[in-house]
Amino acid sequence: MHATTVKNKITQRDNYKGIMSVIVVVLLLTLTLIAIFSAIDQLGISEMGRIARDLTHFIINSLQD
């Protein structure tokens, strides 16, 4: 009986760790997206167009090599 209780507590702790890991990852992704959109907002639309064009050229040139 005692071994089963210990095993259940270990399983609960593992489940808790897994849930906390997912929560931390979601929070980090959310903060990253907020930072990206904030940077995009500060750059403005014309800057984003230039960056997108440069990035497209870079990707195309990388694929041609």
UniProtKB/Swiss-Prot annotation:
Pfam families: SafA. Residues 1-18 are cytoplasmic. The keyword tRNA processing does not apply. It is a single-pass type II membrane protein. The chain crosses the membrane at residues 19-39. One of its GO terms (cellular component) is plasma membrane. Induction: By acid stress, via the EvgS/EvgA system. It is found in: Cell inner membrane. Residues 40-65 are periplasmic. Its main location: membrane. InterPro entries: SafA (IPR031411). Keywords: Cell inner membrane, Cell membrane, Membrane, Signal-anchor, Stress response, Transmembrane, Transmembrane helix. It comes from the Bacteria. Belongs to the SafA family. Interacts with PhoQ. Connects the signal transduction between the two-component systems EvgS/EvgA and PhoQ/PhoP, by directly interacting with PhoQ and thus activating the PhoQ/PhoP system, in response to acid stress conditions. This is Two-component-system connector protein SafA.
